[in-house]
Design a protein with these regions (language model features):
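Extracellular/oxidizing-compartment recognition motifs
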Residues: 1-340, 352, 368-373, 388-392, ...
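Intrinsically disordered/low-complexity terminal segments and short unstructured peptides
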Residues: 4-7, 122, 460, 707, ...
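Generic structural detector for well-ordered beta-strands
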Residues: 25-27, 72-74, 215, 274, ...
Length: 719
């Protein structure tokens, strides 16, 4: 329970974005064995203990709640004098909330700034008027106008001496209560415990590449600390690569343009500068005026403490490197929430998040971030049932089809972890989503176009429509209609799981009705494809994917449809790779995934250290919806999939095409599984190690299937 008081600057004016400083000096007779700290701030804090950065937060939250962070400061404290020093970003009352910002992705409440509770054993320290505070003289904050400039905001750092004054007590902190609220009135400053681990921090090197350039081995996120000497000004620019848009080729080709978000630093003597918000960069360029010189850079990478198997080998160096950059992509897009990209929006989008979860599940058994994401999107729901396409954020944005991916998140979490209670607590929101779409079905039986952004994928043929399918003068969304069928049927399974058979039957009836309308209005017998609209003019791979996955088409007919889809001009991009691959796999055409996998492998020749947003002319160099290799190498090459965590069922079916060996750990709903296989002289050998109690269906390359509960399995067959 967090017991403390909010403090603020006595002269705080919230007409501008401003960083406020807080400090407290105290003495300990001995270094404590443990020193638990609770801390929260409005809107963001960075905490330093005895000059060392200890934490930043608070964890991003929805408008319904605010988190406080808990960590142990024992390693930072010492016998004798200690200092807690906190930088807190206060947002202007008239802040431009149209900026899609993670800074704005936390609740602003009453302009209260900082609350701390530190138990050092011999003393308990809380924020009160014995703390000192100052308005920072060092930095001006400029938020970006739009997406294109990236990295959130720039700072302009100046010299100056803080004017320290006693802090002002504002209001008590209200956290989890053991007694009922009097009259049911809840304090709007209520805070709840953080649901995810604190972010890790580690130092990574940037090499001096000459001409003011500093280059890291791979794209990274974190806090750079620069030390300058001299008199004049330094401009610090951060970029993901050389080149931009269609100009991008080799990401380290210095003949290409260089542009990026920048910080400006005025130097008069010796100055150490660290931006308030983390920076995303692979390349940093320093430009100076006067006699200013950079004398030191320490870059502390920061992110979610994600673990992953480090002993995997997928049979060739190229795929091992592709695995590595795919994992790096996922890690860069994983902070206090999943995020679409770390350089630009830094926002948790539903489509991106649903895919990131699946990739995350292959690497470890930590579902804390996934559970938080599911909760975040549930809390974003409007009264009419539609979910925000990205959340937390204060700027509402609606991409209707993204609400479907919330259902996907819940279903995949259940398959992987078997948590029926999580399914049950999300059923009401799922029903709300489906009701909203039911209201969009018109007399044709199809979903009509909405007043929002009907984005599906970044197909190049949909460039002029910003990812919306081109449908001519038709006002219907056939692809979204096919998605609706798929997710109605998925939701029916979830409802039935929780004993809501009536809802399940209703969902299936609605799915059958929309499927029949698609068959009648969109099937083109001559092309052997489903059209994206009722005039049979436009066709896409995306439409065939959902008609296959949803069961609108099945069997040999579905296989023929997917074969016909392969040469279509409107192709699935990296964002749709997972669904494209699953549809191909479902009809026995998995070998056709090599076309896109080869595009991903080609990124290695371009010196990419992460997977870009799109295959062609990417804006962002790091979008984890394209980290598909994580899933394919774990679930297909090694062949390990969770069938049902609740029933402790696994399926292990190694895919050997084009390889002679593979090995690695895969995390499942039945714990960690080690698989190793190889082919020598026409003999296939397989070794499996799993935890006790896992029921395994093993499928061999010759089609033989057998089941076993043995923890260790060895088998050999002649091919």
């Amino acid at each position: 329970m967090f017991q403390s008081t909010w403090i603020t600057h006595p002269s705080a004016q919230f007409s501008d974005n401003r960083i406020y400083l807080f400090r407290k000096t105290f003495t300990l007779t001995e270094k404590p064995a443990s020193a638990p700290l609770n801390i929260s701030a409005e809107a963001r804090y960075k905490l330093f203990v005895n000059g060392r950065r200890a934490a930043f937060g608070p964890c991003r939250s929805s408008g319904e709640e605010k988190y406080y962070d808990t960590l142990d400061l024992a390693d930072y404290l010492q016998a004798g004098e200690n200092e807690l020093y906190c930088e807190v970003l206060g947002l202007a009352d008239n802040a431009d909330l149209t900026k899609p910002s993670v800074i704005f992705g936390v609740r602003r409440s009453g302009n209260l700034l900082l609350a701390v509770e530190l138990d050092c054993g011999e003393t308990v320290l809380r924020t009160d008027d014995t703390w000192e505070t100052a308005a920072s003289p060092y930095a001006d904050i400029a938020f970006h106008n739009g997406y294109a400039r990236g990295a959130m905001f720039e700072e302009e750092a100046h010299g100056g001496t803080p004017e320290w004054v006693p802090a002002k007590k504002a209001a008590r902190v209200d956290s989890i209560r053991e007694k009922p609220y009097p009259w049911g009135i809840v304090n709007p400053m209520f805070v709840i415990p953080r649901q995810i681990p604190m972010m890790y921090q580690k130092t990574v090197p940037f090499a001096d590449a000459g001409d003011g350039f500093l280059i890291a081995d791979e794209l990274t996120n974190g806090f750079p600390k620069f030390t300058f000497e001299g008199h004049g000004r330094a401009k610090i620019m951060y970029a993901e690569s050389f080149g931009s848009g269609g100009e991008k080729k080799d990401r380290l080709d210095r003949s290409l343009s260089f542009n990026g978000v920048f910080d400006l630093v005025d130097v008069d003597g010796t100055l150490t500068f660290e931006p308030f918000w983390f920076r995303c960069a692979r390349i940093i360029r320093i430009e100076t005026e006067g006699d200013v010189k950079l004398t030191d850079l320490v870059f502390d990478e920061a992110g979610y403490p994600m673990t992953y198997p480090e002993t995997c080998d997928f049979g060739n160096d190229t795929d091992n490197k592709l695995w590595k950059i795919s994992v790096a992509t996922l890690m860069r897009c994983t902070q206090e929430s999943y995020m679409d990209c770390p350089y630009y929006e830094q926002l948790q989008y539903a489509m991106d998040t649903s895919l990131q979860m699946i990739y995350n599940y292959q690497l470890n058994n930590d579902d804390a971030l996934a559970r938080k994401a599911i909760r975040d999107f549930r809390l974003s729901q409007r009264a009419d049932g539609l979910l925000s396409s990205r959340y937390p954020t204060v700027e509402p944005q609606y991409i209707p089809s993204f609400s479907f991916y919330y259902i996907f998140m819940v279903a995949e979490h259940y398959k992987r972890f078997g948590d029926k209670a999580l399914v049950r607590e999300n059923l009401r929101a799922i029903d709300g989503v489906l009701e909203w779409f039911d209201g969009c079905v018109d007399e044709t039986g199809l979903l009509k176009r909405t007043m929002y952004w009907d984005f599906i994928d970044w197909a190049t043929t949909w460039g002029r429509t910003a990812g919306e399918p081109v449908v001519g003068d038709d006002c219907h969304m056939a692809i979204a209609s096919a998605m609706y069928v798929y997710f109605l049927r998925l939701a029916a399974d979830l409802a039935e799981l929780c004993g809501r058979t009536g809802a399940a039957a209703e969902y299936r009836d609605r799915a059958d009705a929309v499927a029949a309308a698609i068959e009648e209005k969109c099937w083109n017998e001559k092309r052997g494809l489903y059209a994206d609209e009722t005039n049979s003019v436009y066709f896409s791979q995306q439409m065939q994917v959902w008609c296959t996955l949803s069961g609108i088409a099945d069997g040999e007919r579905a296989r023929q449809i997917m074969e016909n889809a392969i040469p279509l001009e409107t192709k699935c991009t990296f964002a749709y790779a997972y669904f494209w691959f699953r549809a191909l796999e479902q009809v026995g055409l998995y070998h056709e995934t090599e076309r896109m996998m080869n595009r991903l492998r080609g990124l290695l020749d371009l010196n990419c250290s992460t997977i870009p947003e799109t295959p062609d002319a990417p804006r962002s160099e790091c979008h984890a919806w394209g980290a598909i290799a994580i899933y394919e190498f774990a679930a297909v090459v090694l062949g390990v999939r969770t069938v049902s965590a609740a029933e402790k069922k696994l399926r292990i079916a190694p895919h050997t095409d084009g390889r002679t060996y593979a090995k690695g750990d895969v995390y499942t709903g039945c714990g960690k599984v080690w698989v190793e296989w190889k082919i020598e002289n026409g003999i296939f050998w397989l070794h499996i190690e799993s935890e006790e109690g896992a029921h395994k269906e093993v499928v061999l390359p010759n089609g033989a299937v057998y089941t076993t509960d043995d923890a260790v399995v060895d088998c050999t067959i002649k091919l």
